């Protein structure tokens, strides 16, 4: 992103770090439960649910709208995962998921304020 709001938008780096940390926690939890983790870019592509945007560079406003929509969708996926954890009495993963839901809702709020501000 470029322009007069570059510094404000640079705060999105914090969101990227949160998401990266979340993926690390997910992989660690999967391994603790005896599961497999993603092994390659192809593996990621085959399992991803949020669509990539491979178009030409979008304007900043459109990018923020897309990020907000992605976070809203991720919140729904996390809530579904939490329900699954509850059904299987997996308290530890449910607890992690609660934190991730909170972080995702916070990112959505931040993006909404930036978009509407």
Language-model features and meaning:
Residues 24, 28, 45-99:
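Acidic/histidine-rich alpha-helical segments that form the ligand environment
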Residues 5, 17, 36-48, 65-73, ...:
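Long, contiguous binding/interaction regions
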């Amino acid at each position: 992103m470029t322009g007069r709001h570059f510094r404000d938008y640079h705060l999105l780096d914090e969101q990227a770090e949160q998401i990266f940390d979340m993926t690390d926690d997910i992989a660690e939890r999967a391994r603790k439960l005896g599961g497999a983790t993603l092994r390659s870019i192809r593996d990621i592509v085959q399992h991803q649910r949020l669509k990539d945007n491979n178009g030409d560079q979008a304007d900043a406003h459109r990018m923020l709208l897309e990020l907000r929509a992605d976070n809203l969708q991720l919140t729904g996926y996390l809530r579904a995962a939490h329900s699954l954890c509850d059904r299987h009495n997996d308290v530890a993963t449910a607890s992690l998921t609660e934190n991730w839901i909170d972080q995702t809702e916070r990112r959505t709020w931040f993006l909404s304020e930036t978009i509407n501000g």
